[in-house]
Amino acid sequence: MSTALLEARELSVRFGGLTAVDAVSAAFHEGELVGIIGPNGAGKTTFFNALSGVTAPTGGRLWVAGRDLTSAAAHHHARQGVARTFQTPRVFGELTVAANVDFGLQFGGRGRSGSRLLKDEASILRLIGLTDLAALPAAAVTPSQQRLLEIGMALATRPRVLLLDEVAAGLTEAEVEAMAQLIRRLRDDLGLAVVWIEHAVTTLLRHVERVLVLHQGRKIADDAPAAVVRDPTVIEAYLGDEMAEAAA
């Protein structure tokens, strides 16, 4: 297989005596759509923070497209093509929707080649379905639209890896399905490695090809969805029999 776009090798994050991420290894390749699930407090977001340079690992190594970025700050990760969203969308409420996307372009996108689908502000707004809201302040759009906008801002940096942290949280059932379809389109049309944390487990398992399961900071599974929902360790630690049956 080709060099991973993003690879964690025995990655750990400790806060004093608390180990939030415990020697997790995982590799993500171009065109992959990978889900990460686990109970609250499993270390999922902390793992994302380490992958994106927001939090410095305290052990292990982190490689981006073959470069060791273990100790690098978040902006170095972004310059190498790693973009992410957050559980609570981080948009500039006083700026227009279009200006938020333009911020992403100015930050990292203009100097890097990318798909024609990401060539400019208008193209990105069209891709995420916010063209008609371009002139509105970001604070004036709905929470679900702010989630889409944050994805647009991430795409504007023309990433190779897109890390999505609970982008379906708080959405209606129809909005969750629409979000999942958008995520698949981004993977299919842009060739990104997409890594998606989500508590809407049944939706996530329908759309990803591989699932990592974290529990108490450790990786307890890394396999196809069909295998994960039958894994006794995963069922005991997180899914339970009822959820496993629903997701199967």
Where are these regions (language model features)?
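Glycine-rich phosphate-binding loops of nucleotide-dependent enzymes
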Residues: 2-248
